[in-house]
Amino acid sequence: MTEKKPLNINIQSEIGGLDAVLLHTPGAEVENMTPKMAQRALYSDILNLSIAQEEYAQLSGVLHKLAKVYTVSDLLVKVLDNETERQALIGKICVMEQVTDYFDMLMDMPSARLAKVLIEGLPAKINTLTSFLNEDYYALFPLYNFYFTRDAAVTIGNNALICKMANRVRTRESLIMEAIYKGSGEFSCGIINAYDYQPGNHDIYMEGGDILIARDDILLLGNGARTSTQGIDLLTARLGALVSEGRRHIIVQQLPHKPESFIHLDMVFTLLDRDKCMVFEPLILGDNQYQTVHITMENGKVVKINSVSNILSVLRRLGMDLEPIICGGESDEWDQEREQWHSGANFFAFAPGKVISYARNTHTLDELSKHGFEIIPAWDFIEGKASVEGDKRCVITIEGSELPRGGGGARCMTMPLSRKPVKWE
């Protein structure tokens, strides 16, 4: 019997043909929330789980037809089946979340049950005065945001970056992702764990929605509420240590901390094709107070840092001449703001010129149609009524009345693991 080889992690762009992707279907963790807990959970509203799952089934169904799909739950069970990996992960979680008295209980659970608890939450034992008076219902809080698999870890080249999240409520996501990359046996990659560097420095944090790979030598980073300048400095230093030869470019876009729809760069800018991108015009192209900074690296060292007019201007100088397509359309700023709020700029490319987005952002879709993109409803593609073959540009649309309430779109909900190389010329 031939031994199964692990998948080599390889992401050199945002648009290369998708070979493998990591997903997590929203489950009971999303429903284990009250309106009072929504803010702590980083939600603007509570979700209707059954509708959210129906919408997510469209995204999952599309991706199952396009690439190999891995799921967080299945991989986590594989990790927990290994006693050494189980002990390491549960130990880290118990120490990080200050619940060491639950260690033995968690270790005794069957793997499938334990995986469920780690994601959906564990109610606290009421057996002391402290626990009786504690207002928190959970010892381990549900991972409300885990269906946004993009944020807790990032694949860059042949490496997985384990992100140090901006909010402690999401720390367990990063621990689980590290365990999956290290201990599931499914992947072959280098690992950069941001928690290993200056662990006491709370000013260091970054999330995957702020990290876009424009080209193998160009990284786009957002600097806002979820990714700090110190986090970017750490990422720059670690990547410099890994890639010690040649010239590399890091382009940093400052972001507003409010409103919450600007939490990540991919909420205002995503790549669609070799020569096209989706932008929220007021921030990316308009006159505003938010800087765009170009960091040039030579042989792993920073040699120049300078301000530039915008992302597109510096990409053009680097040989990527991108035509901007405007989120919400070109004519009405209200439409732009409304559709950006519901992840109208957040696209996931599964091949050059072939993307996935929400169906609700009609003005954005009209703008894409004007630029030659065929609009394909998800179920038409899943059921074989429409094709994405050939050179045509297309956007597959999924329903999105509940999923956007969590604060993200198609790119946020996908963690690409392997893509084909892009022929740039």
Q: How would you label these PLM feature ranges?
A:
Residues 2-425:
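The feature marks the mature, well-folded catalytic cores of soluble enzymes
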